[in-house]
């Protein structure tokens, strides 16, 4: 199989660390509401790649995370701080964040089945990895690769990463702070 390599901007042969196994990680859903077409596209593309590799004789191991806690986002594009999506939905519906997460996780799997998208082999939940995330964040802050902003959120320090922008094509000197 050949895929477009964003780093080299060329179409390359897919190579794996083990000749007969392709390990694939793809972002999974944030389970605070129904998935939309844009979300499902990600899962469909992952499924198509996995099916193609299996058709070519490779074993695939697919992992998709379930974000069931702590999803902060600025969906406005205006640089405003948005509420945690799980907590906002909890306040709106009167259900606990866990009840919401488990309900929409179930709906997500039903949607995959309806679309004939093969399920991933593993679905680790963010809520199961909080301690390791906190440890990693602490390490990033201590090493100068992340910092705490004025809003008490933790941000990655792009300046600390010499090859920042190699994948996206962005250059730090051309980016405007606070803009997407």
Named regions from a protein language model:
Residues 1-180:
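NTP-dependent nucleotidyl-transfer catalytic core
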